[in-house]
Amino acid sequence: MRNEVILQRIHRNPYEFAYTSIGCRITYAGNEEGCTVNELEGAITDDTCLIAFSSHRESSGVSLEETITIGRRHGIPVVVDAAGNVLPRSNLKKYARSGADLVAVSGGKQIKGPNDTGILFGREDLIKMAKLQASPFNGLGRGMKVDRTQMVGLLVALRLFLDVTPEEEITECSSWSYRAHWVVEELKDLEGVSRAEVTAPEPWNVRVMVTFENSISARALAFSLRELDPSIWVETSMMGKRDNRIGIAFDCLNAGEEKEIVEALRTMLS
């Protein structure tokens, strides 16, 4: 049985465990700096069952279009992880029309549906194979079942997400930028904060990066924020031991929640 997954090394991420947990092994193409078409194609063997593509590094390494071309040339499916990359909303159509064999997106994050749901679309035959992991079959997906009410919640959230016009989306992104700059003004002179800045490589990707003084552990602070009621969750899985900063992502916040974050940080650092 073919069980080899090809992944560009520059596309590495914590979620590749989803492949190895079901018995696949990953072969990395290229290096941490990038990957060429020849390197990606040269990694393919008789055991290759799919080529994985991480959309969060779409601008790095071999492009999605080139990856799909390679996959088709060798008869190997290309699976795109577009989990939190559905903004702008036109991205959903872009991936659907890209020719990728399967595309997976998160039902939470930017769509704001139930966090333990997702959407898988692509080739009908592969979708049918994925459904074999669902009830009434007791396969590897049995422990990851999604309740019917969550499915309805995801469908409603998706409809609301797609009902937004391009003009409304621009207004939404402008609001994120305004709120992000407000956060910076509130935090930049706070004791324990060495720097606070807005980063927005795209209008729909607005972040505030808060860097703390060396005497403060960002990781410890992150875990303390989780213990609050309501909990403020800071992802730490990709945080290095010496990484002394946290990011605030506005595409995952409701209006006004940034004020709760600022107040929590002010209380903890005072």
Spans of features found by a protein language model:
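Intrinsically disordered, low-complexity coil segments
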Residues: Y95, V164-E169, T236-N244
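Conserved PLP-enzyme active-site core in the AAT-like
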Residues: M1-P166, C173-S174, V184-E191, F212, ...
